[in-house]
Amino acid sequence: MRLTEQLELDINKDLFIVPGNHDGVTKVDCKNTHIKALNDNPIDDEAPESFQALEGAFRDYEKFVKDMIPDYPELHPAKTHIRCWRERINFVHCNTAIGADGKKKDRQLMNVDELAKCSPSGEKTNIILAHNSFEDMDARIQNRMKDWMRIYHVAAYLCGDRHRRELTSIEIDRKKNI
C-alpha cells in the first residue's frame, strides 16, 4: 500500500508546493536585465513588468504542477495565490525564487503586488509557504510583506531553501511576532 493511501492523503487536496531556485529554468529574454532592475528597486512602478517577464521562467514548473495535480485551482501555480486546505487553513503560496540564481541567498525577490491582491477568506488560519526564508528577502519586500501579514493575521511563514530545521520570529510590529 502506498504511503499516501495509508495516511489517507489526497494529492489534489493535501499537497502544497512552491517553486524553488531550480524551478525557474524556462528561457526568458533579458532575464538578467529584469533581475537587475528588480534588485535596484523591487517595488518600483515598473516592477510588475519585470516580475511578469520573469514568471515566464516557471512554465516548466507550472506544467509539472498541473501534470501532478490536474485540477489545480490556480491558472499559474508559480504566481502568488491562496489554496484553502480542507476549509481550515489558508496556505498562501509565494514565489520567492523569481530572481534566484542558485548562488546568492540574500535580497531575494517576490512580487508583493500579487501578494497584495490575495485576500484570505474567513476566520481560517493563514500560513505563508515560500522557498526562501523571510530574512533572505530584500528588506523593502520584507516591509511590504509584514504589512500584509499584520492585516491578515498570518500565523506562520514556512520555507525550505536552506534545508534545515530552524525557528525564527518575524517581528510584525512592536506587539506581535510570528
Sequence positions of predicted segments:
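Extended active-site neighborhood of metal-dependent phosphoesterases/phosphodiesterases
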Residues: 2-106, 148, 173
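Active-site flanking residues adjacent to catalytic metal/cofactor-binding acidic residues
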Residues: 1, 19-20, 130, 160
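His/acidic metal-ligating clusters that form di-metal
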Residues: 80-173
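Metal-dependent phosphoesterase/phosphodiesterase active-site architecture
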Residues: 175-178
